[in-house]
Amino acid sequence: MTHDIWRLTTAFLTMLLTAGLALGTGCASDSYAAKGAAQGGTSGAVAGALGGMMSALVFGGDIAEAGARGAVWGGTTGAVAGGISGAQTDKAVAAQEQAARDAELERFKAEIGTDAFNGVVALAECKHDIAIANAREAAKSNKPDYALAGVWVEALTEADRQREQEARALLPDIVERDRDIKTKAEAEARMYEALDGLRDIRVEYNLPVNCSS
């Protein structure tokens, strides 16, 4: 059910956003442009989806909707940049695609911090040890939002590799840091909601759904 909502929301927002951007940018029709758009769209969408999911965890909001919106903005930005670049020289292509990727990454890093962002990307790729290392660095931050994001990434990572006891042990820390979550039960429900969102992202972008540790 969650994945159905994800797909419907993403499809609808993509249709609206792509139509609006196309009016302002025009389109490139050669094969390189199409390839650039596809690659830029996919990588941007994954980053956007993960960033949206984490932003919802830290700042509040619907996780599935935030992830879908992040995927649409990230994917469309990458696809349009890739399509435009495809009509130009290789050097210009590389510069524009890199600029689009960097801008998207920096936006989410500014919201949740570089360590937490790197951690959730590693988690999506089933790199649990790397995710934990980044999460713990994030949790040391003197910026409360960054630190909270780090604890969330660690909890999600432990839950994803089916270490339920370790994941639940982090819930009191989340309750203490999060302004909106008042009980361990609320934190646990939110954790599993985010875990479902993470797995939806993996399904959508052909990443392994269940990781073997």
Which ranges hold each PLM region?
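Short, solvent-exposed mixed-charge patches
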Residues: D30, S212-S213
